Amino acid sequence: DKWQMPQGGVEPNEPLLMAMKRELEEETSIKNVKVLKEFDQWLEYELPENLIGKIWKGKYRGQKQKWFIVKFTGEESEININTKQAEFIEWKWIDMNLLPNLIVAFKKNIYEDILIELKKYVN
């Protein structure tokens, strides 16, 4: 099994910050966060050949992503992944250093880049 952090698409004309907050709430019910950092750069990955045409209805070959570092300021009781269109089957807090090894291999480089930035904000 592989893990990933919440993520999602941006609606037409939707500001990136609003998209991040909307996706976070849609996927986890989390509303209470403090934004610490919007990544300056976009992060990208390509799907491996064996997945091209098999996921995302065959429309895409990869993704370009804008990431945010946020601090959860709510109570754990507000976290609910059993949402209308549930995308996760489980959640947990982990040591951030484990992130790159828990994600699917083709996203590992992105998670390594995220970890570099994240370490600047976490004691």
Q: Predicted regions span which residues?
A:
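Charged phosphate-binding loop/patch that engages nucleotide di/tri-phosphates or the phosphate backbone
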Residues: 96-123
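N-terminal strand-loop-strand
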Residues: 1-5, 17
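Unchanged
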Residues: 10-105
